[in-house]
Swiss-Prot record:
Residues 15-64 are annotated as: Disordered. This is F-box protein SKIP31. Component of SCF(ASK-cullin-F-box) E3 ubiquitin ligase complexes, which may mediate the ubiquitination and subsequent proteasomal degradation of target proteins. It holds the Pfam family F-box-like. GO terms for biological process: protein ubiquitination; ubiquitin-dependent protein catabolic process. Keywords: Ubl conjugation pathway. Residues 22-64 have a biased composition (Basic and acidic residues). Pathway: Protein modification; protein ubiquitination. Part of a SCF (ASK-cullin-F-box) protein ligase complex. Interacts with SKP1A/ASK1 and SPK1B/ASK2. It comes from Arabidopsis thaliana. SUPFAM superfamilies: F-box domain. Residues 68-114 form the F-box domain. The keyword Zinc-finger does not apply. The F-box is necessary for the interaction with ASK proteins.
Length: 316
């Protein structure tokens, strides 16, 4: 046998081996397909279990909950009822804890109530809503502190600064948490007072009564609902604090007025890690030791001498 014949024979054996390997693969192709179908079903089941576990830290409104600790089982919509007992100083402290509390402690209904308790609703609510209530509160507090330091007697500046800072720890009274009269503008408030007076109701809030749309009847003035039994006032607007998720899971329903809205309590993801921390720290500057140089300049700008400057900077 020549060399060329041997090469041809080797090439023929190589082709036979390739053909036989392809046939073997085709014979085993159907069983593999069956295994793939089983594996696909198992994969779906596993994915479903993973989704259920992941959704364990989410409520029906698709808002994330706290991932660990005793608050993991608390529905998101209940946090506003927990945080409404806190002062502005406490809310700012909560916002520094984690992403979720930063989101929950910035609730507009909380800061609107604190703002109106401290300063009253001096301007039409539509104009005020051009900015967030939290920002309005912090800006107004900072302006008041600067103005107080400029105008108060230099000998008593320390005490005035202490008194002004103490206002940040003012929490709502029980009557202010069940009654929304404090957040009404003067025009609507006058209408509410006249109606209550005509029905023999006083302006004092009743704290032992829980208003519900299923058991109470109401008199309505615009978006204000007045309980005919107690006279307690509820404002049902974009910042309504009494909303819950409907059984269908697609609308938020006020438990007092029955008004529905499609506004869900959704926590938006930050653009980058640590974004919420930076924002919370900036907002907390007025309440903490941050931005000391800026406040030192503002508080000491009108000091007459070095001794007065030193006394002022103790509280910067």
């Amino acid at each position: 046998m020549s060399v060329s014949d041997e090469e041809d024979e080797c090439f023929a054996r190589f082709l036979e081996s390739e053909v036989s390997s392809v046939e073997d693969k085709e014979e085993t192709k159907e069983p593999e397909a069956k295994r793939q179908r089983i594996e696909k079903g198992e994969t779906k089941a596993l994915e479903k279990d993973e989704d259920q576990k992941e959704n364990g830290n989410k409520d029906k409104t698709d808002a994330k909950r706290i991932e660990s600790g005793v608050f993991t089982n608390v529905p998101t919509e209940l946090f506003r009822h927990i945080l409404k007992f806190l002062s502005s100083e406490d809310l700012v402290s909560c916002s520094l804890v984690c992403k979720f509390l930063n989101f929950a402690a910035a609730d507009e209904s909380l800061w609107r109530r604190l703002y109106c308790i401290r300063w009253g609703l001096t301007l039409p609510s539509r104009k005020l809503r051009e900015s967030a209530w939290k920002k309005l509160y912090i800006d107004r507090d900072e302006q008041d502190m600067i103005e107080l330091v400029r105008t108060c007697p230099s000998d008593f500046k320390e005490y005035y600064v202490h008194m002004q800072a103490a206002k940040r720890s003012q929490a709502p009274l029980p009557s202010q948490m069940v009654d929304d009269r404090i957040i009404l503008d003067n025009t609507v408030l006058e209408q509410v007072s006249l109606w209550k007076k005509s029905k023999g109701l006083t302006d004092k809030a009743v704290t032992g009564h829980i208003c519900l749309g299923t058991k109470c009847s109401y008199h309505q003035i615009d978006d204000v609902f007045i309980c005919k039994e107690t006279g307690n006032v509820h404002v049902c607007d974009d910042n309504c604090k009494e909303v819950i998720l409907s059984p269908e899971g697609d609308l938020m329903v006020c438990t007092i007025s029955g008004v529905c809205s499609d506004t869900l309590l959704v926590q938006t993801e930050p653009d980058a890690d640590g974004c919420y921390e930076e924002e919370a720290e900036l907002e907390a500057e007025v309440f903490t030791d941050k931005s000391r140089l800026a406040r030192a300049f503002e508080l000491g700008y009108n000091c007459d001498d070095e001794q007065e400057l030193e006394r002022t900077l103790r509280f910067c």
